[in-house]
Amino acid sequence: MDREYGSYNQRSVNSYGNQSFSMDEMGDSNFSRFGPYESYDSRSSVGGRDLYRSGYGYNDHEQGHFGDSYDGRYENPYRNSVDSFEGRSQGGSSWDPSFTRSKVRTGFMEDRGRDSYSSYGSFSSPYMKPAAVGSRGRGMPAYPENAFGGRSNDAFGGPSKGRGRGRGQMPEYGVMRRHRVVVEYKHLGVAARGAARGVKRKMAPPFKPVGFFGKKQKLSKPGANQNKSVPPPAEKLSEEEEEKRRTEARREKQRRRREKNSEKYGDGTAFTCSFCKFRSFDEKGIEEHLTSATHQEMLDHIQKQTKFDKPVMEFLHECIVNKFKKTVARRVQSVANEAAKTLEKDVMEGVNPDDHMMKVETVHCSACSVYVPALHSSVQLHLKSADHSKSKLTYKEQIKRESILTATSILNNPLVKARYELYLKGENPFETQPDEQQQEQEEEEEEEEQQEQVAVSEQEPSEQETSDEQAAAIAAEPEGEDFTCDPLTTTDEV
């Protein structure tokens, strides 16, 4: 459809009166429509309210709010940009005027649309003049002296940047598009950058220096793994050699255990009950324990937890009694060979008076894992302490748990199973040959070692705690106690 552009231009110009420029001025060149710049209004001062001024009272409350420093005689580009922004925010198209021609007053109109026209015939400032039709097309600046037309935020669809800030030295404008605005920040100043905030920007890759490289992966040399020497495969031994090797290792282990017990308990062999964790150096003490109610109560607890038959529990009791008898025989043999034994080294060898050390007797509490001085007052003080009362109950429960493990491990031993078969037949299972006796002794010692390891893992004594307990016990003795007695010659019975 053909259109008469000339008639359109003529009608648009005639519809607005009091224009400060005419079609003749615009015919010379595209930019001749802009008059010379005048920094001062050449009109005479008009008293009262200016009829051609915008309807806003800039001296009212909004003036103080926006910080305006201009009086009412000068038109403010910030207010015009706000009016233009409000016109678009009300749902109207940016290409259609936000007013009806019937409401237009001669010589005045609010600038509300992107293509709307204002009549500023009485204003001589060229930056206040509106652009002609099509002058604010896509990618074109609105005004010659300002890349953003003094209303820079209009190009981005946002609020104006403020009054009195659009007349300075303007930076170069970037590339702007209507539907997708792309801003190149390299050539924009501070004011333009602030105007472009909130606009979708190009996602540039992060800057990396020229010599910057990412984390290098650790590379292994191809021949590194080949240089590692592979251990030769172990030679397969026959069953007899393997059994012999295990026997020698077990005997060496038992020998070290005997030396450890000798250093711990002395040359005297201790009598022990594996179920009750009872230890005594006196034959009478172990005999009384095996016939006591405490030992019988422990056997009943084992039977209740393991569901063993009565013959099994009787056999386990006989095993403990047989162990006691073997210990007695070993002690007699050691006494016979006492003459051939080397003399024991003196414990106090190398101790000088300056070392302030002395040999004393102590009482060991297995429940608390502490050593108490062999004094009546110290022992009684420890018995009445709250720690001992609590540790005593805990230690008793621990013994009950370990007794079940001990009974189960004894019955799982192949040698003990063979003896149990003989015991059920009515034979004496403990009459063995010397070789079997040696093997049995090694197995019993190994069993005791396992039991002690379990006990140590659950409750390991601390030397520091022991010394602290001893110091506390000595410091807490009553004031009336006589400390003049010699601990080495004391006759207090513990």
Swiss-Prot record:
Compartments it resides in: Nucleus
InterPro entries cross-referenced by the UniProt entry: AKAP95, ZF_C2H2_AKAP95
Chain ranges for the short sequence motif Bipartite nuclear localization signal as given in the UniProt record: 200-221
Name recorded for this polypeptide: DBIRD complex subunit ZNF326
Zinc finger feature spans (C2H2 AKAP95-type): 273-295, 365-388
MF GO annotations: DNA binding; RNA polymerase II complex binding; zinc ion binding
Family, as annotated: Belongs to the AKAP95 family.
UniProt key word Zinc: yes
Major subcellular location class: nucleus
Positions of region (Disordered): 1-22, 147-170, 202-264, 429-494
Biased composition, class Polar residues, residue ranges: 7-22
A single GO BP: RNA splicing
Amino acid composition bias (Acidic residues), ranges on this chain: 433-451
Assembly description: Component of the DBIRD complex.
Function according to Swiss-Prot or TrEMBL: Core component of the DBIRD complex, a multiprotein complex that acts at the interface between core mRNP particles and RNA polymerase II (RNAPII) and integrates transcript elongation with the regulation of alternative splicing.
Keyword flag Nucleus: yes
Keywords, alphabetical: DNA-binding, Metal-binding, mRNA processing, mRNA splicing, Nucleus, Repeat, Zinc, Zinc-finger
Domain of life from the UniProt record: Eukaryota
Originating organism: Xenopus laevis
Gene Ontology CC: DBIRD complex; nucleus
